[in-house]
């Protein structure tokens, strides 16, 4: 129910508020997908609480000094699969592939 309400609010923003803002300040969005699309995907994929936090973090990254670009919503890890850290690294998988260092190789 709450997710549907959030989706309706985002749809209203994209249909009524966003076009007005872009008419007043042309130039488009810095990011792809747009922040409202990102929020809709994040809420659908991660749920209202986590999706809203992800959307707010995205809004904080949207400022004049940001380069923008492609910034997709992170995918949920598959059950039983390796879990990625926030920066995309996979420490566990990398650690298991490392060869032990000998004491002589410094």
Curated annotation (Swiss-Prot):
Annotated Gene Ontology cellular component terms: plasma membrane
UniProt-annotated location(s): Cell inner membrane
Chain intervals with Basic and acidic residues compositional bias: 94-106
Highest taxon of source: Bacteria
Residue span of region Disordered: 71-106
Record has ATP-binding as a keyword: no
Record keywords: Cell inner membrane, Cell membrane, Membrane
InterPro entries listed in its UniProt record: Membr_insert_effic_factor_YidD
Residue ranges crossing the lipid bilayer per the database entry: none
HAMAP family: UPF0161_YidD
UniProt-recorded name of the protein: Putative membrane protein insertion efficiency factor
Species per Swiss-Prot/TrEMBL record: Acidobacterium capsulatum (strain ATCC 51196 / DSM 11244 / BCRC 80197 / JCM 7670 / NBRC 15755 / NCIMB 13165 / 161)
């Amino acid at each position: 129910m709450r997710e549907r309400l959030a989706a309706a609010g985002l749809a209203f923003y994209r249909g009524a508020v966003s076009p007005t803002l872009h008419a007043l300040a042309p130039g488009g969005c810095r990011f792809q997908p747009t922040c409202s699309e990102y929020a809709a995907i994040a809420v659908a994929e991660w749920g209202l609480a986590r999706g809203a936090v992800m959307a707010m973090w995205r809004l904080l990254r949207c400022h004049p000094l940001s380069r923008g670009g492609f910034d997709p919503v992170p995918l949920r890890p598959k059950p039983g699969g390796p879990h990625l850290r926030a920066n995309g690294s996979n420490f566990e998988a990398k650690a298991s592939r490392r060869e032990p260092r000998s004491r002589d190789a410094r």
